Amino acid sequence: MTNFSSSPPIAFGDLQGCHAAYRQLFDTLAPAADTPLWFAGDLVNRGPASLATLREIVALGERAIAVLGNHDLHLLAVAAGIRTLKPGDTIGEILDAPDADDLIEWVRHRPFAHFERGMLMVHAGLLPQWDAALALELADELQRALRAPNWRDTLRSLYGNDPNCWSPDLKHADRLRVAFNAFTRIRFCTPEGAMEFRANGGPAAAPAGYLPWFDAPGRKTADVTVVFGHWAALGLMLRENLVALDSGCVWGNRLSAVRLADDPAARVVTQVACERCGAADE
């Protein structure tokens, strides 16, 4: 991993093509040129300017650390012919762009997890049996598979809900699928780590027998700060070792960024309103 400065990184929540809100937030923050910029996934889709958003993040070069979210992977799957565009998708402009191939390649080479300064960033979450080392090992397996020449076949095999819980005995596609779903889809799980994929409300709406993944008893990543997005109904949430960043910009709420100081008490939140996102073209 690359360290550009001793400055704490700034982590952004799900942009989802909300380019105007991102520009406003970036300009408000006015980060120094060497400040690392982290993005918790879902750079694109549903917002009105997915193409402009993606191009801008790509242009940041190695300064930008962006993990893969479910909408970013949906873009790859549509580009690969594995899935089709759905109502509400706004990624068609990326697929039709003259630089589409370069943009797709950039997305395909993003990581599923990033660990630095004692902080682990993923898009959605982690299973309770994983410590940081195992999470990074699984992320690396997924990353290498998606960067291989047969990545389309691999991506096709990753979609599905089963198995829905971790076992060290899992192999091949089953092992990768569980990791894929935890990194990019999880919100709720049982205390034993069995994932549930239908519920998308806040913690109070947890199905019977389930709880937010980060509250699973004995979670082995409780000793690091986990930074994640994905869960708009949860909203911005900061605990000593937890930073939830998706505050529902694409739904007309707010876009959030957090300056990730090593001391939790020194972490600074900056937000902008997102009234225009999803309502009209920029």
Swiss-Prot record:
UniProt keyword Hydrolase present: yes
Top-level taxon in the UniProt lineage: Bacteria
Record bears the keyword Hydrolase: yes
One protein family per Pfam: Metallophos
Under Enzyme Commission nomenclature, its number is 3.6.1.41
Keyword list (alphabetical) reads: Hydrolase
Q: Which reaction does it catalyse?
A: P(1),P(4)-bis(5'-adenosyl) tetraphosphate + H2O = 2 ADP + 2 H(+)
Coiled coil regions in record: none
Output the Gene Ontology terms for molecular function.
Answer: bis(5'-nucleosyl)-tetraphosphatase (symmetrical) activity
Task: Report the SUPFAM superfamilies cross-referenced here.
Answer: Metallo-dependent phosphatases (SSF56300)
Q: Which NCBIfam families match?
A: apaH, PRK00166.1
What protein family does this chain belong to? Belongs to the Ap4A hydrolase family.
Q: What does this protein do?
A: Hydrolyzes diadenosine 5',5'''-P1,P4-tetraphosphate to yield ADP.
Record's protein name: Bis(5'-nucleosyl)-tetraphosphatase, symmetrical
The organism that produces this protein has a lineage beginning with:
Bacteria, Pseudomonadati, Pseudomonadota, Betaproteobacteria, Burkholderiales
Gene of origin?
apaH
